[in-house]
Design a protein with these regions (language model features):
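Short low-complexity stretches enriched in small and charged residues
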Residues: 17-31, 52-57, 96-102, 156-163
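Extended intrinsically disordered, low-complexity coil regions enriched in Ser, Thr, Gly, Ala
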Residues: 21-41, 87-91, 102-126
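Short, flexible, solvent-exposed loop/turn segments with mixed acidic/basic and small polar residues
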Residues: 1-5, 84-90
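Conserved short beta-strand elements that form part of the metal-binding/catalytic scaffold
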Residues: 34-85, 128-150
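Long, hydrophobic N-terminal alpha-helical segment
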Residues: 1-49
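Vicinal oxygen chelate
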Residues: 1-6, 10-18, 61-68, 86-103, 108-163
Length: 163
């Protein structure tokens, strides 16, 4: 693996939990996180998981502590890295570190060239995301995400607590 920094800008810690409400209560108690925006039963567009098309349905919530975004995900249905994580860690925990990139395809090529393995990808509108695993960090995935204008605006509103 390369000693160069990962592409993009670190912005997110992602948790996967078996129960979204309990996970949010835990983070609020632990971190004093303000309220989270909750999105229920979201189906990923163009879902792909471990080599083939996938229907990935999950609920998720976003909140900020300072400049760090916390994403909390509860898998609902389908095969996904989220369900796979809960099979290994039934109580849930830190699943990924998220990096915002301007060029998703170039960042993907960079990670693959470093020996990372693409596990899951999908889109929401023009937003593209992918989860990667590596032997360097077997417990936590790396997510790269290109944020379209709508999602950037939503995240700004969440950070400002104006949603």
């Amino acid at each position: 693996m390369s000693s160069r920094p990962l592409p993009g800008t670190f912005f997110q810690i992602g948790y996967v939990v078996p129960n979204l409400e309990a996970g949010l209560a835990h983070l609020n108690a632990k971190l004093g996180a303000p309220r989270f925006m909750v999105l229920r039963e979201i189906v990923v567009e163009n879902g792909w998981f471990r080599g083939g098309p996938a229907t990935i349905n999950h609920s998720m919530a976003f909140g900020y502590v300072g400049d760090v975004q916390f994403e909390v995900i509860e898998p609902v249905a389908g095969n996904s890295t989220y369900a796979e994580f809960l099979d290994r860690v039934p109580d849930g925990g830190v699943h990924h570190l998220g990096f915002s990139v301007e060029d998703y395809d170039a960042a993907t090529a960079d990670l693959l060239a470093r020996g990372y393995k693409l596990v899951q990808r999908g889109t929401f509108g023009d937003t593209k995301f992918g989860y990667f695993e590596s032997s360097d960090d077997p417990g936590t995935m790396t997510e790269i995400v290109y944020l379209d204008a709508n999602v950037r605006g939503m995240f700004a509103n969440i950070k400002a607590q104006t949603f």
